[in-house]
A protein has these predicted regions:
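RNA/tRNA-interacting regions in translation and RNA-turnover enzymes
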Residues: 1-205
Length: 205
């Protein structure tokens, strides 16, 4: 079961935005009833062990929403408008055996805060949520992986193709191009997940 550390300041911000007063002691006492066992509650945050069947509670946003519903009887009915987009993503047939299912979506109207700190906290929380989904539902990216990108910095249409190990690009947090072979040997994330692609001779990009 994953154990996560949630920041008091982020949880307080989220609850205040929804008219709820955040009380970490109340969480310690009552949240175990919905599969959230509190391991530690210190000055910085609250550490919670999430039950395996509650993968919907792996982020600040989702656990704060669950607490509003459970502790404060706030009704929540998601109302998302979903429509067909006009951005094309072409998947090369050679990808079928590597990644048989590929999905994409554009999410708009997300409130990521006003101040620089709020925006930074939002991005950090989003990345942590992504990694926890990789670890749990994605089985360390063996079954599934997620990519989150800033659409304003990308130019559609998008093409998903397969390449060999000599293909080069600039990986995350690097300032120079690296080949896939180099990434799998020396980049932190590449080394961490190299085992997922150890039997591949083609790689999806």
């Amino acid at each position: 079961m994953p154990t996560l550390k949630f920041s008091h300041s982020i949880l307080e911000y989220m609850q205040n935005k929804n008219g709820i007063k955040y009380n970490s002691e109340e969480w310690v006492e009552k949240m175990p009833s919905i599969g959230c066992v509190v391991e530690e509650n210190d000055n910085e945050g609250i550490e919670i062990e999430i039950f395996p069947d509650r993968t919907d509670l792996l982020s600040h946003e989702t656990i704060a929403r669950a607490a509003r519903s459970f502790l404060n009887s706030v009704e929540y009915s998601p109302d998302f408008e979903v429509s067909e987009g006009n951005i094309d993503m072409t998947v090369d047939p050679t990808i079928e055996k590597i990644r048989p299912v590929i999905l994409g979506a554009v999410v708009r109207g997300v409130d990521n805060g006003n101040s620089s700190k709020e925006k930074d906290d939002f991005i950090q929380s989003l990345m942590e949520h992504q990694e926890k989904l990789h670890l749990t539902l994605g089985r360390k990216r063996k079954f599934a992986s997620i990519g989150v990108h800033d659409l304003s910095k990308l130019k559609p249409p998008f093409n998903v193709i397969s390449v060999d190990k000599n293909h080069s690009f600039i990986p995350l947090a690097e300032g120079k191009e690296m080949s896939i072979k180099e990434i799998l040997k020396s980049h932190p994330k590449g080394k961490e997940y190299a085992h997922v692609m150890e039997n591949m001779n083609k790689y999806p990009v």
